[in-house]
From Swiss-Prot:
Protein name per UniProt: Ribosomal RNA small subunit methyltransferase C
Listed Gene3D superfamilies: Vaccinia Virus protein VP39 (3.40.50.150)
Family that this chain belongs to: Belongs to the methyltransferase superfamily. RsmC family.
Organism phylogeny: Bacteria, Pseudomonadati, Pseudomonadota, Gammaproteobacteria, Enterobacterales
Gene label: rsmC
Keywords: Cytoplasm, Methyltransferase, rRNA processing, S-adenosyl-L-methionine, Transferase
Pfam families tied to this protein: MTS (PF05175), MTS_N (PF08468)
Signal peptide: none
Species, as recorded: Yersinia enterocolitica serotype O:8 / biotype 1B (strain NCTC 13174 / 8081)
Subcellular location: Cytoplasm
Length: 347
């Protein structure tokens, strides 16, 4: 994330516009542009924990991580620079939140790659700000307007739910598998045929559906759920509460905030960061797993069949097995073995 994204490079083409402004950066911001940006004031709101980690080292308390921005975050800001995300519903949710807090008359800049659907920003905001496209470069569009009217925003109105068997799943915009259980997670769940117990870590927990389904089958599991997404963290907590299941839910960039070791780590790891393909999280998951598993502990993940995870698993664990597969997905499992005995040590 050290290099600038195409969207940030487009913003830099207009850097003179921002020198005297108090700028709020938000949305799918994936680089450190705010930390090196020349403006009268800089604030950042992000719902991605790993983006907060990157920026907080430089911007300290001027970076907020959370599901929604607060009045304190946007205080004194007269300009919004919003990075368009992959999910249109997530954009609607975030912009409704941000524009409900910003003052009428503030400048609104929306930037994003064309393939992300940023063109729909004009229509989406037509009732609140008249956007005009002011630049097109690096396969991105940059739009500008002024806030004419603050939208109303109620975060509670954005919750949705569905069921997986007897499990109630609570979801929010931007959460993976928001409308139904995805086929990869379904295949992963199918590999758990017998009840088990112990401590289990779900990395990239989404709405918490894996833990809640497995908790019905194996109620003695001690669960820890983690994700980088603030929306996923809140959705997991709501799903757990709806099903009367206790678990620890924390924000963590893979293992960054994970303490202790587990009997099992499960995951349906992402291979995108926003709209960009990225195997970073999955590579960190696999390479760091042995440091967070007991001897005999298992890493069980589901992934698209074409992704290069077998070699990573073999490098980290020495071997792996395929528990299930279909036309698109495979479920891999690798086990932590006992380290070889040092022949120089006495028994």
């Amino acid at each position: 994330m050290s290099a600038l994204t195409p969207a940030s490079e487009v913003i830099l083409r207009h850097s003179d516009e921002f020198i005297a402004r108090h700028v709020l950066f938000a949305g799918d911001l994936q680089d450190a542009l705010p930390a090196q940006f020349d403006a009268a004031g800089i604030r950042v709101h992000t719902n991605q924990y790993h983006h907060w980690q990157l920026l907080s080292n430089t911007l300290d308390e001027n970076v907020q991580f959370g599901l929604v921005a607060t009045p304190e975050t946007v205080a004194a800001c007269d300009t919004l620079v919003y990075y368009w995300p992959k999910s249109k519903q997530e954009a609607q949710f975030q912009l409704a939140n941000l524009l409900s807090l910003l003052p009428v008359g503030c400048d609104v800049f929306v930037v994003g790659e064309n393939r992300s659907g940023v063109r729909s920003a004009e229509e989406m905001l037509s009732g609140f700000a008249q956007l005009t496209k002011i630049d097109s470069a690096r396969r991105c569009g940059l739009y500008h307007g002024r806030l004419d009217k603050q939208p109303e925003f109620d975060a509670d109105a954005w919750w949705e739910s569905y069921q997986v068997g007897d499990v109630i799943v609570k979801t929010l915009p931007g959460v993976f598998s928001r409308d139904a259980l995805d086929s990869g997670s379904h295949l992963l769940l199918s590999t758990f045929s017998e009840p088990f117990k112990g401590s289990v870590l779900d990395v990239g927990c989404g709405a918490g559906v894996l833990a809640c389904v497995l908790a019905q089958q194996s109620p003695k599991i001690k669960w820890t759920l983690s994700d980088v997404s603030a929306a996923a963290i809140e959705a997991s907590r709501a799903t757990l509460a709806a099903n009367n299941i206790e678990a620890q839910v924390i924000a963590s960039n893979v293992y960054s905030d994970i303490k202790g070791r587990f009997e099992m780590i499960i995951s349906n790891p992402p291979f995108h960061d926003g709209i960009q393909t990225s195997l970073t999280a999955a590579e960190m998951l696999i390479r760091g797993a042995t440091a967070h598993l007991h001897v005999g502990g298992k890493l069980r993940i589901v992934a698209n069949s074409f992704l290069p995870y077998p070699a990573l698993l073999d490098a980290a664990f020495g071997s792996h097995e395929v528990l299930a597969q279909n036309g698109r997905f495979k479920v891999y499992q690798a086990t932590v073995g006992r380290p070889p005995r040092d022949p120089k040590k006495k028994r």
